[in-house]
Amino acid sequence: MSSPDNSSPSLRIPPWLRVKLPCSHTFADTRALVEGLGLNTVCNSAKCPNMFECFSSGTATFLILGNVCTRNCAFCNITPGHVSPPDPDEPRRVAEAAARLALRHVVVTSVTRDDLDDGGAAHFAATITRLRAALPAATVEVLIPDFRGDHAALRTVMAAAPHIVNHNVETPPAHYARIRPQADYRQSLELLRRVKAAGGVAKSGLMVGLGENDTEVEGVLADLADCGCDIVTVGQYMRPSRQHPPVERYVHPDTFESFAACGRGMGIPFVFSAPLVRSSYNAESAYNALCTLRRKPA
């Protein structure tokens, strides 16, 4: 597949990636509530381009287990370095924030904690349990690390019964040594297979603009379809700072639509593919759409 994309990292950000900042009291209120409870959000820590829209609608993706990571993925804006012990009160505060925001769909992610024996799985489980008790009508989505391939850690998370388990593969395997040097593509696929085998809703995602080509993206979609992924997100990589890898190409919206059609053709029920799509963006809509599809008669 060829695509009408701009492959020069020196050119300006195209107009379809320019975000209009909304004026909203809800944005300020959401941010104040989260910060007042001593919580982190991936929206702020990762400089997500959708933060203003999400905060203005009263939603957020909670970042647990601190805001310092034990890994140093090239694309990520979260600081690597020395980490602190998990805060045992954090699950309660996440649930309190979600309840005060009256969330219908709660997304929880974390930094990678290779220093912990279980990679933070028990902390995830405690957070899920607290959320389900505080908001029994809400759905809970977790975006988890790979737990270094620890199957017992994944079982701990699954036992807490999250509605969606998301684990992003991020980029095609040929680029892992440069972009995700401490991760393993096949290990990530195996995690997703195990989520499906346990009866869970499996979700994954990747970015484009990190040096991959369209054929490689289609290869990742094929792998995710083979894993049985229910939901896949594809979005544009945006360079957080000059210390991060430059954007290799800005992918045209038409090409994103082609990726979505390709993934659906491979059997993935929902592929959300657009320049500003991120793994947590419109997460509630994606889950509701999947539930609607499953209720339809064959």
Curated annotation (Swiss-Prot):
Binding site for [4Fe-4S] cluster 1: C43, C48, C54, S280
GO cellular component, one term: cytoplasm
Protein name per the record: Lipoyl synthase
Keywords attached to this entry: 4Fe-4S, Cytoplasm, Iron, Iron-sulfur, Metal-binding, S-adenosyl-L-methionine, Transferase
GO molecular function: 4 iron, 4 sulfur cluster binding; lipoate synthase activity; metal ion binding
Pathway(s) the chain acts in: Protein modification; protein lipoylation via endogenous pathway; protein N(6)-(lipoyl)lysine from octanoyl-[acyl-carrier-protein]: step 2/2
Disulphide-bonded residues: none
Enzyme's top EC category: transferase
Listed cofactors: [4Fe-4S] cluster
Predominant place of localization: cytoplasm
InterPro entries: Aldolase_TIM, Elp3/MiaA/NifB-like_rSAM, Lipoyl_synth, rSAM
NCBIfam families in the cross-refs: lipA, PRK05481.1, PRK12928.1
Gene: lipA
Localisation per UniProt entry: Cytoplasm
PROSITE patterns referenced in this protein's UniProt entry, alphabetically: RADICAL_SAM
Radical SAM core domain ranges (all copies): 55-269
Record's cofactor remark: Binds 2 [4Fe-4S] clusters per subunit. One cluster is coordinated with 3 cysteines and an exchangeable S-adenosyl-L-methionine.
PANTHER family assigned: LIPOYL SYNTHASE (PTHR10949), LIPOYL SYNTHASE, MITOCHONDRIAL (PTHR10949:SF0)
EC number, as in UniProt: 2.8.1.8
Binding site for [4Fe-4S] cluster 2: C69, C73, C76
One Pfam family cited in the UniProt record for this chain: Radical_SAM
Catalytic reaction equation(s): [[Fe-S] cluster scaffold protein carrying a second [4Fe-4S](2+) cluster] + N(6)-octanoyl-L-lysyl-[protein] + 2 oxidized [2Fe-2S]-[ferredoxin] + 2 S-adenosyl-L-methionine + 4 H(+) = [[Fe-S] cluster scaffold protein] + N(6)-[(R)-dihydrolipoyl]-L-lysyl-[protein] + 4 Fe(3+) + 2 hydrogen sulfide + 2 5'-deoxyadenosine + 2 L-methionine + 2 reduced [2Fe-2S]-[ferredoxin]
